[in-house]
Amino acid sequence: FIGFGKTKTEYKYFLPGKEKQLQAFMNQYCTQRKRKDVMQWLPKKDKEVVKLPLTTQQKKYLTELKNSYQTEDIITQGVLDRLIRYRQICLDPGILDLKSKSPKTQWILDFIDENPNTPVIIFSNFTQYIHRLTDTFRAKNILFSAIVGEVAPKVREEYVRDFQEGKYNVLIINTMSGKEALTLDRAEAIIFTDLFPPIGAIEQAEDRFVATTEDKKDKPHVIYNLVMADSFDEDIIKLLQERKTETEVINNFRSSLERSSE
């Protein structure tokens, strides 16, 4: 190929012996650089995995779900559905109308209480959880905004602008809705309540708060990954570190189910 999807035999104006000149010309426009190559001052992200203990009720629900296809009134169909319910129980059993507090929600509340002046972005893959979290924040008079798929573009821009201008310190975002086209470099911390492939979407979400100018490079850049200890939540983190795909994570979960049934 010599450019624009054409081969030598297809390219009408190809001049024999001019391949090198053409390639040099194209290289001026096709060079891809990583941001780190262009902005060498980019700060390092400090990542912390926060392992939280499962509640007694969470343990019960997860054990039942691994040993059969249901827990309480929740009946699953297939491995993927089982994995989704498993992840939701780890995040907040209330999503499924199950009785149990959410250790992850409590950790977030404690973080905000202890760091009231820290601009923070909270990411979740589950819109149902975001709605539950917003209800909790309203009840506790915590100022925030939330960006999910149904938020109109103009409203989304308004939320971003207000956060960047410091009108509030908490912004909740659906991971897939906020993985790109958002500049939120006022934030000093990111909290991931739950993680799932693709790893590229997670990395894009992480980049939302990276300093965009050199004068902001020294601000904190801390990423907290909330994980339920002694659960498949921990396995997901490890698999993501190995850049595993969604299919590979699902297959790994299937294997864990097979082991638990032996």
Feature-to-residue mapping (PLM):
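A conserved SF2-helicase RecA2
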Residues: 197-203, 210-262
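SF2 helicase motor core recognition
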Residues: 130-134, 156-157, 171-220
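Inter-lobe coupling linker of SF2 helicases/translocases
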Residues: 1-103, 110, 114-118, 223, ...
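Conserved phosphate-coordination/catalytic loops
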Residues: 77, 98-106, 124, 150-157
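Conserved nucleotide-binding/hydrolysis micro-motifs of P-loop NTPases
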Residues: 56-58, 127-129, 152, 177-179, ...
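Conserved helicase ATPase core of P-loop NTP-dependent helicases/translocases
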Residues: 121-123, 131-132, 138-178
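Short beta-strand segments
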Residues: 51-53, 87, 119-126, 146-149, ...
